[in-house]
Amino acid sequence: MVYLATDKQTYADLSITETANNEQFLFSLFSKTETKEGKALMLNWLMYPLSDLEEIRKRQEAIVWDALPELLLNEEELDFIEYYLAYRDQIREAHILLSCATVIDRLVRYDSTRYVICRGVKLVVHLLHCLKEWATELPQGAPQLMKESAAMIGNILHGSELEEVLEQTSDEEKRLSNFVIDKFDYLFRCTRLLSLKELLSVIYLLDVCRTAHRVA
């Protein structure tokens, strides 16, 4: 993307991050995002404006679109996913014997690390299903920016281990075995970590567009 060159004086003149008279600065008008990462993306949009007219038009179309969906997960769930993916404890490849051997120990002894892993895996699985459904059901007349996001989701999922996760968890209510949780955990926090970060960026893009739509 091509960005417009700006400096501190430009930010001050536009009252993007502060004002001299304690007036409401521009970012405060748009900081009503529902997620922390959405807020960071909104600030990035304001601090680094685009100069490419085509990219600007894409953003404008997305912001004024009346069919912007509700966020696919709530703030607490998204925060937990971010925490889980950044969690570096006990990242190891799944082994069925080890998974079976630790079943009883996990039943009788509370393990905070195991809680993070189990809940994190279930939330990521839910995220994958939500994103696939959103991308699949996106209206044909949706803005180009939304279409590009849906295409990115499809490209990441198609033929990948993440698509296999979707197939294996078609019934989200079905309880996952310890071995499956261990297998998915290694996939999410190691093998396909960057892919999941890209998928999460779609949620934050929706958050920014929804917020700008409300304020505008």
Predicted region positions:
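Conserved amphipathic alpha-helical "coupling/scaffold" segments
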Residues: M1-A216
